Amino acid sequence: MKADANDASAERGLATIAWLLISFRRGTATVDEYLGGITKQNVALREAPADLASRFNTHIARATMLAEAMLRAKPRDAEAHYQMAVTVGLQASYIATVEGRIIGAFRAARRAYDESEMVLELDPARKYAGLITGVYRYVVSQMSLPLRMMAYVAGFGGGKERGLQMIEDAAAYRSESQADARFALVLLDNREGRYGEAMRQLAELQRVYPRNRLLWLESGGTALRGGRAADAESQLSAGLRMLAADKRQRMFGEEALWYGKRGAARVTLRRLDDAEMDLRRTIAAADARMWVKGRAYTELGKIADLRRDRAAARANFQRAAARQWIETAYSLQR
């Protein structure tokens, strides 16, 4: 910031930190949160902490002002259009994921889409600019029909396969946004059931960011979804050792997630006693989300069923169902 008072990317970085801290405090910084469909115009979410919301809005406003000034000075410069694209793209992401306003994010998202398209028109070699366009193409393809029609009318392009290819091209291109493209592919490959590809991206991210323990949580979850329980158990056990030694702040409900996922892997591996201990720790966690407890009770039901204890199995499955309904009814807790 002191080195260049006109650096939009520095202000954008500060806004990004505030956004990520909000997700961390809510416990929503994992792939699990984004595997469902996009069917609603708005999603009820708990209000963001006022201090962090203020920090985000202050820095994104400054970043936007600086990016606009750069664009006015250099209207045919690809980098100026790129700075505008990523700035308003971040604003759109915040509106959708923190405020829950899907339609409210359309204006900023459309600007980001148009600006990134302009970057590629001015300089097709800048493959990294395709990350924004690719993500929006994919997102539009996953919307319910009414929302998809609204997106088309607003000027968005669709096409899932084209979108994924653009993101893959951005992930393969060495740039400051390469890691962002890899993180995007982790999510989208999980959504598409391409678990091997997601694991490949996660392995590279683990190499680049060896202190980011959540990458081991995501690797374990991805391996579990892909039917690789032994790999999942190994990744999650390694991550839990990192968690125990890490003095940094934990994500809300984080420990419950770790033990719940490892417990599920151990159920699949028929390590039932070890699995039960993990799952009990998940249920006992004071900050465990309802859906996390629901999944833990489901796995305990499986354990009871494998032990031929039908009464315990039924009771645990009923507890799981009850917690899933509670999570739906009280979505403002998320």
What residue ranges belong to the model's regions?
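Short coil/linker segments at helix-helix boundaries
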Residues: N6, I17-A78, Y82-R126, G130-R191, ...
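TPR/TPR-like (Sel1-like) alpha-helical repeat modules
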Residues: W19, Y113, E117, G155-G159, ...
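Amphipathic alpha-helical segments of tetratricopeptide repeats
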Residues: K2, D114, E121, A171-A172, ...
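"A position-specific structural signal for the A-helix of alpha-solenoid helical repeats
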Residues: G13, L20, Q83, L90, ...
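Boundary/linker segments of alpha-helical solenoid repeat arrays
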Residues: A8-S9, A78-E79, K127-A129, E176-D180, ...
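Alpha-helical adaptor scaffolds
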Residues: S177-R191, G221-D231, S237-M290
